[in-house]
A protein has these predicted regions:
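Short beta-strand/loop motif that positions the catalytic acidic residue
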Residues: 313, 319-321
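Short alpha-helix in the alpha/beta-hydrolase fold that links the catalytic acid
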Residues: 306, 329-338
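N-terminal cap/lid subdomain of alpha/beta-hydrolase-fold enzymes
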Residues: 69-131
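N-terminal export signals
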Residues: 7-29
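Catalytic active-site module of serine/aspartate enzymes centered on a nucleophile-bearing elbow/loop
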Residues: 343-384
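Conserved acidic catalytic loop of the alpha/beta-hydrolase fold
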Residues: 144-164
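Alpha/beta-hydrolase-fold enzymes
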Residues: 186-188, 192-274
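C-terminal segment of N-terminal export signals and the immediately downstream linker at the start
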Residues: 23-42
C-alpha cells in the first residue's frame, strides 16, 4: 500500500533512528505500532489538554492541546528531565533521531520530554482546530505561548519544578532562549542548536518571501482553500530549501547525501516538494509567523528589551551555531552570548549548513553528530 509523503517522511525518520540504535541495515518502512516495542527504553505519546488557553495576544485558543512524546522515565527526585523542543515542520519523530544508549540524549539515563510546537499539525494547529478558529482564523502564536503551554505541561502533568535541561534545534533553539529568559532560574541549563534569541531582519525577509510564494497560488484563497494549494506549496518548498545549505555545500553535492541519498538535485527537490506539499499550508504559515515574531524581549517582563531578556537567562547555556548556517549565522549569536551571564559559544565547524544541528547522520556528517554529542555530554556533566 502506498504511503503519502508526509507519512513516508515520518516512517523514514523513525527507521533511521532505529537503525542507528540497533546497528542494522536501514529499511524504508516501519510499523509504527510495533517499533516502540523494539526500543530499549519506555516511551509514550499523548495529548495534554490545555483547555481554553490564554495567548500572549489576549486571544483564547479554545480546546488547546499539546501532543507530547516521552522517552525514558523520571527518577524519584524528578531531576533527570530534559525538554526537547521541536523544529520548523518537524515533530517528536524527528527528534527521536537524536536518541540512543550511546548518545548524549540517552533515554535510559534521562526522561526526554518533547512537546510539539503549536501550528505543527501535531499540537493545536490551523489544520486540527474546530471551526471559528480553524485555517486562517487560527490565532497568532508566539514562542512565549509555546513556552507557557510547556511550563503548564511540565509543572502540572509531570510535577517537575526544576527540569535538568532544555534543548532545541532551529525553531527549537529559539524556544530554548525563550524558556531560559522566563525559567532559567529553575532550569539546570539550556542548549540552543542553530538558532538565535531574536529573529534577524534578514531572516525575517527570507521567511516573508517563502510565505508570499505560497500565498501567490490562486487556490490558496486567503487560507480558505478547498484543496491544497500545490503550486504555492511547491514555490514555498523551492524558496525554503535554498536556505538549507550555503553555496559551497550545494556545489559539493552534500544535499544528495540526505536521508537515503538522492541521484541528483532534481530528485532531492522533488522529495522536498513532496514533503512540504504534504504539510497543511496554514500550518506552515502559522509556524513561519511564530518564527518571524521571535524575540525574547517581547514579553511584559522585559518591556521589549532583548538585552534585558538575555541578561535574565541566569542558567548555564551552551549555544551551538553552525559555521555555514544561512538562516542563523554563527556571528549573530556572539552579541547574544555576550549579554548572558553564564553562556558558552561553541561553533559547529561544518559544511552541512543549517541541518548540522539536526543531530543525525540522516542530515549531517558523523563528525558533526559526534562533536555535538561530545559537547552536550560535557554540558550535562557540568550541570548535573
Amino acid at each position: 500500500m502506498d504511503l503519502d509523503r508526509r507519512k513516508f517522511f515520518d516512517y523514514s525518520v523513525k527507521a533511521i533512528a532505529l537503525a542507528y540504535l540497533s546497528m542494522i541495515n536501514l529499511f524504508p518502512k516501519v510499523n509504527l505500532s510495533e517499533d516502540k516495542k523494539k526500543l530499549p527504553w519506555k516511551s509514550k505519546t499523548f495529548k495534554f489538554p490545555l483547555e481554553n488557553f490564554k495567548l500572549q495576544s489576549g486571544e483564547t485558543l479554545n480546546n488547546a492541546f499539546l501532543l507530547v512524546d516521552v522517552n525514558g522515565e523520571l527518577n524519584s527526585s524528578k531531576s533527570n528531565a530534559i525538554i526537547f523542543a521541536t523544529c520548523f515542520a518537524g515533530s517528536h519523530k524527528f527528534n527521536q533521531m537524536a536518541y540512543g544508549i550511546d548518545r548524549a540524549l540517552n533515554p535510559l539515563k534521562y526522561c526526554i520530554i518533547t512537546p510539539n510546537l503549536f501550528c505543527s499539525g501535531h499540537s493545536s494547529s490551523p489544520s486540527n482546530t474546530a471551526p471559528t478558529q480553524d485555517g486562517p482564523r487560527f490565532p497568532s502564536i508566539t514562542y512565549y505561548d509555546n513556552i507557557n503551554a510547556q511550563d503548564k505541561l511540565i509543572s502540572q502533568y509531570f510535577g517537575i519544578t526544576n527540569p535538568l535541561m532544555y534543548i532545541g534545534f532551529s525553531m527549537g533553539a529559539q524556544q530554548a532562549f525563550h524558556w531560559g529568559a522566563l525559567h532559567g532560574d529553575k532550569t539546570g541549563g539550556i542548549i540552543p542548536l542553530c538558532g538565535t534569541a531574536k529573529t534577524t531582519t534578514q531572516n525575517w525577509i527570507t521567511l516573508e518571501g517563502c510565505k508570499l510564494a505560497l500565498q501567490s497560488d490562486i487556490n490558496y484563497n486567503n487560507g480558505d482553500y478547498i484543496s491544497p494549494p500545490k503550486k504555492g506549496l511547491k514555490a514555498f518548498s523551492r524558496n525554503y530549501t535554498s536556505t538549507l545549505f550555503d553555496k559551497e555545500g550545494y556545489e559539493e553535492g552534500l544535499h544528495l547525501n540526505l536521508f537515503d541519498g538522492f541521484e541528483d538535485t532534481e530528485s532531492y527537490l522533488d522529495y522536498m516538494d513532496a514533503f512540504f506539499g504534504s504539510v497543511d499550508a496554514n500550518d506552515l504559515l502559522g509556524m513561519l509567523n511564530t518564527w518571524q515574531m521571535g524575540d525574547i524581549g517581547k514579553h511584559q517582563k522585559f518591556n521589549n528589551n532583548t538585552k534585558e531578556a538575555l541578561a535574565n537567562i541566569n542558567c548555564p547555556a551552551l549555544v551551538m551555531p553552525s559555521s555555514t548556517d544561512l538562516s542563523f549565522p554563527a556571528r549573530n549569536n556572539i552579541p547574544e552570548v555576550n549579554e548572558m551571564s553564564e553562556a558558552e559559544l561553541v561553533v559547529i565547524n561544518t559544511k552541512h549548513g543549517h541541518l548540522a544541528g539536526g543531530m543525525s547522520t540522516a542530515l549531517t556528517s558523523q563528525e558533526d553528530v559526534t562533536f555535538i554529542d561530545k559537547n552536550i555530554k560535557k554540558f550535562l556533566k557540568k550541570i548535573t
